[in-house]
């Protein structure tokens, strides 16, 4: 196996490159295909928090998997010190579904004033160590760290992938034909269109739209943080003075956001918090399309010389590096 193609340069594709650069460099040539203008990169339209979210081992397969991914990500941050990743506190709480909340966060407390926040009434609140990610900076860092690889980047969209006797033939929007020894599909919500090659294994995957408000030039102090209040999120990036509020979730493939739902989230947060939010009209609306696989579980699939990785749904930044290492391990066994 010498010539590898990776389709997709979101967090899945770039984590793959990074893991390849850190491991054994088995490939003589790696081609990375991506086209944000043709299929918008969800990783650039993401609130991008990595947090344990009160999960612990031994309750569900998905929970175990996410706990493992959080540990891998934490070690990656500690050892590799990537740009664009900031240690923060994740505050999670609310006034509804208290039984669930207390079960998940037994160490929370009722308070009107909690750390950086003042609420209009007592809320149940817990906090945990987490990471805030600036997607543009971290994704760029992952690519820069992969400079030791024999990498060719193509701003082009892959239209067909067919196994032939010499390998895997890839045809693109710009009219090129390439042949590789192996192909990895890391195309996010676009992976579901490649059912034919995967023997229909991807047919149960659903695209899920997520949108949020982004306010610029906001000054809420020196500390970045993430607050989740009854499922509504408020994320403050102190380094870039950005405030994010969201996010919605709608099972659809289109990008027109649900403005009413965003307004409701904004109003709920404004009425719970003793904090003057910027005017709703000042927000830029960001929309990403996530990929939800059965049981919300990420997947690695293989058929012949083709591999698929994805299904990261709401946890792309947690799972990226952990699952990149997993697929590389599996490919080495098959080689
Ligand atoms: C509103 C919102 C909030 C979120 N919050 C969080 C969060 O707090 N924490 C977290 O960890 N995750 C979060 N997520 C989820 C996370 O952003 C996604 O799981 C992750 O970005 C998916 O990454 P990906 O690399 O699989 O896909 P993408 O980022 O979509 O990348 C796929 C790339 O493949 C390219 N591509 C696809 N097909 C082709 C083709 N045929 N040829 C060439 N290129 C192709 C596309 O152009 C795209 O650039 C959130 C998502 C949304 C929408």
Show the residue positions of the predicted features:
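C-terminal catalytic lobe of FAD-dependent flavoproteins
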Residues: 280-335
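Short beta-strand to alpha-helix junction loop
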Residues: 57-69, 125-141, 256-261, 318-321
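Flavin-dependent oxidoreductases
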Residues: 176, 180-267, 275-281
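Conserved Rossmann-like nucleotide-cofactor binding loop
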Residues: 12, 38, 190
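A conserved short coil-to-beta-strand element within the FAD-binding core of flavoproteins
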Residues: 152-168
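Beta1/beta-strand and adjacent pyrophosphate-binding region of the FAD-binding site
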Residues: 1-12
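Dinucleotide-binding Rossmann-like beta1-alpha1 core, especially the glycine-rich loop
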Residues: 47-127
């Amino acid at each position: 196996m010498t010539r590898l193609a990776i389709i997709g340069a979101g967090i899945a594709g770039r984590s793959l490159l990074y893991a390849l650069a850190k491991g054994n460099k088995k490939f003589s040539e790696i081609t990375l295909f991506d086209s944000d203008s043709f299929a918008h990169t969800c990783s650039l339209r993401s609130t991008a928090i990595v947090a344990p979210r009160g999960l612990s081992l031994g309750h569900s397969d998905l929970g175990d998997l996410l706990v493992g991914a959080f540990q891998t990500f934490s070690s990656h941050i500690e050892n590799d010190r990537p740009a664009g990743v900031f240690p923060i506190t994740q505050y999670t709480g609310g006034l509804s579904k208290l039984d669930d909340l207390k079960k998940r966060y037994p160490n929370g407390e009722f308070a009107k004033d909690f750390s950086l926040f003042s609420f209009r009434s007592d809320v149940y609140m817990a906090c945990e160590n987490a990471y805030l990610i600036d997607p543009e900076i971290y994704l760029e860092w992952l690519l820069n760290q992969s400079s030791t690889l024999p990498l060719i980047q193509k701003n082009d969209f892959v239209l067909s992938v067919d196994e032939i006797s010499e390998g895997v033939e890839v045809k693109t929007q710009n009219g090129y034909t390439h042949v590789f020894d192996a192909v990895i599909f890391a195309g996010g919500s676009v992976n579901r269109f490649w059912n034919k090659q995967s023997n229909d294994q991807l047919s149960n995957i659903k695209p899920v739209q997520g949108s949020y408000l982004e306010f610029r030039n906001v000054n809420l102090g020196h500390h970045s943080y993430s607050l989740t209040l009854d499922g509504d999120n408020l994320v403050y990036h102190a380094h870039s003075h950005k405030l994010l509020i969201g996010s919605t979730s709608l099972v659809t493939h289109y990008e027109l956001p649900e403005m009413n739902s965003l307004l409701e989230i904004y109003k709920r947060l404004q009425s719970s918090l003793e904090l003057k939010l910027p005017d709703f009209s000042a927000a830029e609306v960001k929309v990403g399309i996530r990929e939800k696989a059965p049981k919300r579980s990420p997947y690695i699939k293989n058929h012949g010389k083709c591999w698929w990785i994805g299904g990261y749904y709401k946890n792309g930044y947690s799972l990226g590096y952990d699952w990149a290492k997993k697929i590389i391990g599996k490919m080495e066994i098959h080689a």
